[in-house]
Amino acid sequence: MLTAQEIALTPQPAHLTVKDGRFEFGNQLKAKVTPYQGDSIRMVFESFKKELQEATGIKVSSTQKEAKARIILDLNPQLPAEAYKLNVSKKQVRIEASRPAGFYYALQTLKQLMPRNVMAGVATSDHSQWSLPSVEIEDAPRFEWRGFMLDEGRHFFGKDEIKRVIDMMAIYKMNRFHWHLTEDQGWRIEIKKYPKLTETGAWRNSKVLAYGDVKPDGERYGGFYTQKDIKEIVAYAKKKFIEIIPEIDIPGHSQAAVAAYPEFLACDPENKHEVWLQQGISTDVINVANPKAMQFAKEVIDELTELFPFNYIHLGGDECPTRKWQKNDECKKLLSEIGSSNFRDLQIYFYKQLKDYIATKPADQQRQLIFWNEVLHGNTSILGNDITIMAWIGANAAAKQAAKQGMNTILSPQIPYYINRKQSKLPTEPMSQGHGTETVEAVYNYQPLKDVDAALQPYYKGVQANFWTEWVTEPSVLEYLMLPRLAAVAEAGWTPQEKRNYEDFKERIRKDAELYDLKGWNYGKHIMK
């Protein structure tokens, strides 16, 4: 009988029991799927059935007679939305869940019990002797938010790579793709009301970003997603139960937007403005006192709510220098009008206007707002506590501060969850940030709720890995730095703390090297030895 470690499920289920015997596939199977809200569960199973047949040739047909079914998907209304039960015996595979997401995650687990080529979608003719270990699994995520953020403002990767990233997330039951689409160095999403955002803001005169001895290379570089592209990617993610959270970083980190429309976004429109060619933090922020800038932000949000039919929009809020506001007469006048002497409160005021505007929209277009934790430096009482704080710098303290104010929070600590940083001290590591201390082990061993009072824990909605791309220009480097650290964060988001063990994880994740190779994904091979 196999051990749980030999079965190698990642993330580790909440409860796993290995039993005697095996389920033999054969060449054909019958399945019974419980109807639910039209065909929503059946559509999840049809996708699995197609993948299984393409990879193995095994045909699955439908039956309404449970006695004839060898795979059964049965509704269990008592289970939480993403929870499932999976029972594999000698005779049948039985899955219970209350929502399509639970059935999807159960089928992801079922694929992990199979040879890795099924998960990879790679065909094989050698399936006649296939079997599954007999197991009983009761599983549910620890946190509702299990996220990954990709910065494409600095470097653009394109539609195909984004789908690969979504595939990586789906394998490990992650459910939030935070898409950082705007930066000082580039604006990556088509906004029809403001075409110059992509005509001008999506392009710059250097692929590499200047830093220290690294100088601009003069190469015309950029790219953006059309609204057609966005809709295609959203549809792709929805099939994998991943919500996409667009981030439009305003009013800071906005030099690309300012370069596109300096006449109403710049604090100093008389000066030259261009898409930034450097790393670091630009002082060229949006003039929040210009009514046309406020209108711009509202109309960008209008298009975002049409493109992303999910619950959240991220408006940034980090690293917003106030230097140009301090020199701008309009901004100084506005600060006086709102009764403050803290220029950071201009940012909070700006967000308050946008939050109030979103509240006037039809119910299906209203969105909850997320901000980086620097907004806590301003008078957040203006905003209210019905916002979410994404804690990255001084993350543990910031998350507690937000929770004490009654705000939901997501942990994305710079150390160790910034997985764009070097993952080892090996000389073969690609050029990136960090000193190689954000190893897989360091990422895995971070405990999200360590020293958090029980009364505050309900405000902690989950965890997120972040990937900033100042140094990363190629998909192969992106993937190398992501894998397998992404899986370590995924397990923190899914698996109960008492079930987590790094040595066990390391043995399980090594078996995914075959999956990565079959998918053609780059990864940290030194970790898999």
Name each model feature, range by range.
Residues 257-263, 267, 274-387, 392-401, ...:
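Active-site neighborhood of glycoside hydrolase catalytic domains
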Residues 31, 99, 148, 169, ...:
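Conserved, mostly hydrophobic/aromatic
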Residues 5-143, 477, 489-527:
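Contiguous, structured surface segment used for ligand recognition
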Residues 368-374, 381-387, 393-529:
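Flexible, acidic glycine-rich loops studded with aromatic residues
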Residues 79-299, 303-312, 464-469:
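Feature activates predominantly on carbohydrate-active enzymes
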Residues 39-40, 156-158, 184-190, 251-257, ...:
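Flexible loop/turn segments at secondary-structure boundaries
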